[in-house]
Amino acid sequence: MEHPPGEAWPELVEPRSWNPDLPGTYDRVARPYADQFFTELERKPFDRELLDRFAERMRGRGRVCDLGCGPGHVGRYLHERGIDVFGLDVSPAMVALACELNPAMRFEQGDLRALSLPADSQVGIVSFYSLIHLERSEAEGALRELARVLVSGGLLLLAFHGGEGAVHADDWFGHGVSVDATLYRPDEMATYMEAADFAVEAITSRPPYEFEYQTPRVYAAGVKR
């Protein structure tokens, strides 16, 4: 999840019904979201460098899942670098749009908390700004599900908003929504990953670019034991 530049989320002091209709929310904003973010990697050299490293390690090893793929731009970046990658997203409209924008790739609908993928079927998972839509209490369980579908030695690359607490939006791209996002401390995410059977390789962060929502950006890489 990203947010249009120049707009702010108020802090969520007392969570409401947490993301009561996340698929519907992304269905409503799919087109403007893609218009805003489909080419964002062109302006994010740090992210491209991390994805290039990920691609170098994944090339020729097997299938990779872009989890929470949105319009498919992260998966497309990997596909263009020779990775056997497909995208999965909770929003049917976002999946349809990703298929339209990336006709050479495969996309499907799914929930990262209960994946339809077989155990030990992926050599890598990249998931940018997807775990933020879970309540903090769900994070470890979701990571265990990701570990289930990864082969031993498979690589996980996460991106998330750094910080404390959570944020909420009632309006997104001009649409009425009710959407929540959890902010995670780097050490907190490392703890969840280790508990879910990942050996954490690296956690890095960067300040937000001026055109991004102004939270620290954190990236965590781990290998399934």
Could you say what each language-model-derived stretch is?
Residues 2-59, 164:
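Conserved class I S-adenosyl-L-methionine
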Residues 63-67, 71-114:
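Class I SAM-dependent methyltransferase SAM/SAH-binding core
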Residues 113-125:
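A short acidic, Gly/Pro-enriched loop at the edge of an enzyme's catalytic core
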Residues 140-152:
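A short glycine-rich, Lys/Arg-flanked "PGG" loop and its adjoining helix->strand segment in the class I
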Residues 153-160:
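Conserved beta-strand signature within the Rossmann-like core of class I S-adenosyl-L-methionine
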Residues 162-180:
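Short, glycine-/aromatic-enriched active-site segment of Class I SAM-dependent methyltransferases
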Residues 181-196:
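Short alpha-helix
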Residues 198-209:
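Conserved S-adenosyl-L-methionine
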